[in-house]
Amino acid sequence: MEQTIASVSLREIARWCAWLLTALLITTAVLTSFGRSCWACELLSHFPAQLALVALIPCVTFAVVGRRRDLVIAAVIAAWNVAALVPFYASVPTVLVPPPADARVIRVVAVNVAAENRDRARVIGFVRATRPDVLVVTELNDFWVRALDAVAADFPIRRLEPRDSHYGIALMSRLPLTILDDKPAGAHAVVARLPQPRLTIVGTHAFPPLSPQLLLRRNQEFAALAAFVRRQAEPVVLVGDLNSSSWSPAFRDLLRDAGLRDTRLGRGVQSTWPAWLPMVQIPIDHALVSPGVRVHGRFVGDRVGSDHLPVVLDFSVDAL
């Protein structure tokens, strides 16, 4: 009799713990929709993969204790999070065919080197190994200006804007492009234009939305970026650390308002931060393209001593 009571009690405890976890997951799903105006809700939107795994715990628990109705509810929550991942694995990629024979394939590499990082050998080694046509570096400071001297000869066109904060930025190019002074108002960005094929490249580093004030500034940056991209007569490639995942409501607004496409679609989530903790990594370093840009390859590079992983994008531009 005592064993039966203990068994029932343990089953009930497991059930109620599973329900508590399910309630937290439901609350999280609801709160993420308020990410445009609530910085904590914005942060909750970044983890559908991890939340899908967590949702398996109540699913298994309800199955074991024989609570079918509860299992259905928990399974719906798990499916909700899985659904956020499906476009990155099931969508048709930006392009399915190789570039035309007469098209030039351009490689852009974006790397947040981390201002405190001192592993110049790994960063320089990665740049030399990937041989980008255009290199965008964020969190540029005086140390990284000196470190990049090692590859300066490979990039005759350069704009380096170091800062003591985390918002220094650089654009370095092998291609005969022009660095523009015209750039998105209020955004940490560098802009270049290539005459042939006609193309605008934007490198940027957005504020992290870690307070109401920073959320507002980040949203203003996104609005400025969207307006700037819309003004361009030629195709646009926008790369950099946006401090926002692909599931953020504000990020989705940026894609919609700018007319850009997330190059992850059909190629996997390709998370980039934090570099040393794969189980909780989220994709906050981006490569976005406008119509007229055909993506032929996109991948995340190896660790370079930074808390971010670099992003590599190969593409061609349709003739205008």
Predicted regions and their residues:
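Short, aromatic-rich membrane-interface segments at the entry and exit
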Residues: 41-42, 68-74
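Short, Lys/Arg-rich, polar N-terminal cytosolic tail immediately upstream
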Residues: 1-12
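N-terminal signal-anchor transmembrane helix
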Residues: 64, 72-129, 181-183
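Small-residue-rich segments of transmembrane alpha-helices in multi-pass membrane proteins
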Residues: 53, 84-87, 228
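Compositionally biased, charge-rich terminal segments
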Residues: 6, 26-33, 259-264
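Soluble catalytic domains of enzymes that build or remodel membrane lipids, polysaccharides, and related
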Residues: 104, 108, 114-128, 134-320
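Membrane-embedded alpha-helical segments of integral membrane proteins
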Residues: 16-63
